[in-house]
Amino acid sequence: MNTMTLLGKVFLLQFLIGVGFCMLMQDPKRNDTKGTYAACFRSQPQGNEPASPDCLKAFMAYAEDMKNIFHFTKEQINYLWSLERETQSLLHNHRRRKRQAVYLPVRKECRLLSELERQNLFYTVRSLKMDTSNPNEYDTLANLHRGAVQPHAHDGSNFLGWHRVYLMYYERALRRIRGDVTLCFWDTTMEFNLGMDNWEYTAVFSSDFFGNRRGQVITGPFRDWPLPPGLTESDYLYRNMTRGRGMPFDSRAASSIFYNPNTIIHSTITWEGFGFDTITNSQGQTRNITIEGEHNNVHNWVGGAMGFLDPAPQDPIFFFHHCYIDYVWERFREKMRRYFRDPTTDYPGHGNETLHDANYPMIGFEWYRNIDGYSDYFTQNVYRYESPTCQACYYSPYTVCGQGNQCIARMNYPGTEIEEGPQVPNGPVAAFSVAGGTMMMSASNGRGFIATSNSE
């Protein structure tokens, strides 16, 4: 046996040991490795015992998929595997200590972080992006959200679970740089409650937070943020917030998801489900409430890179927004339990009947099945959420406590710190057409988020 073959087997053996604690998964669509993932995860080779040929075959097939689907290099695949090994080790250690009190990192609303907490988090995000190692770790993670993911992780039941796993990887990457940082969530219902005329004046689009809201981002911690070549019409991160296209997360939708006793199964709030509750806007237009639909509206509202599938994660806002979507889902899961429903088994299977099937391998994370994203493991072992309170919002310089004990965003009033960056030449004016819920295509990547509403 030559040295390279031996080293390759050692690496794969280490990988198999590292994921030995992983949730079982079986790929029913690939006959040549059917059942292999589950068998490999159940077994843990001892000492110098070689990994079985079937296990080697299964994981080499995964590596081939990642290369063909995402065009990842060997270094990028190894990087993602290393994040998974760390995550599974964390889960395993927490399970071993389940009878003891275990501290879990707390995800809070971004504006309720202390000044130091927020600066540390934003600096760590910037450090992940600006790292010059090969591969660039931020770009590798962002590329997991490229076009091949669209039919697997959007427009159906797997949207929630896939993005939950995706956030976990991203947070693990941040904590490698600084171990005490935790993701925060951007609750855009605080913007919604300002009223439509004031949405764009929210203080988060300032140098203290996310930077300017239009044009190339030239202020704040994410200024002069390079984009991979050819991804958009711009070489740098840009936004294009425009009134009448998209909107913040509707607080009426959030209230229904949190409290309506008639929406207690996932089919009532997932894309292509039967949708129980509706919202009627000021023009008399009615839409069903789904978490994914409300999520799409925020992408369209921020615009720019956020308005299209491929470049969306290049804007750090993406992860703060999706952290809120995950928070909303967790609040819904808590409501399900109050009504004696089990969120871990209530997988509706809406969307593409094959790719969103409960037992289909989760694209990009093939050691999970889609239904594994609905597990309680994440909020029991990796993180938990803290809901905003009016008392906390009262003491924050970026929020106020409004009527009905609702937290509302503070504003940068017109004429105060509303800097805009250079406009993107030939950049898309609108990501999507609202009429008919159809997509307008970007000149560079052709994929966006379907809008569900364009006004209050």
Swiss-Prot record:
Primary location class: secreted
UniProt keyword terms in alphabetical order: Copper, Metal-binding, Secreted, Signal
Pfam families registered for this protein in UniProt: Tyrosinase
Binding site for Cu cation A: 145, 154, 163
Subcellular location as annotated: Secreted
Record's GO cellular component terms: extracellular region
Tissue expression remark: Prismatic layer of shell (at protein level).
An example molecular function term from Gene Ontology annotations: oxidoreductase activity
UniProt: Cu cation B binding residues: 295, 299, 322
Cofactor(s) for this UniProt protein: Cu(2+)
Keyword match Cytoplasm: no
Signal sequence residues: 1-22
Cofactor: binding details: Binds 2 copper ions per subunit.
Coiled coil: none
Family: Belongs to the tyrosinase family.
Name of the protein this chain belongs to: Tyrosinase-like protein
Organism: Pinctada maxima (Silver-lipped pearl oyster)
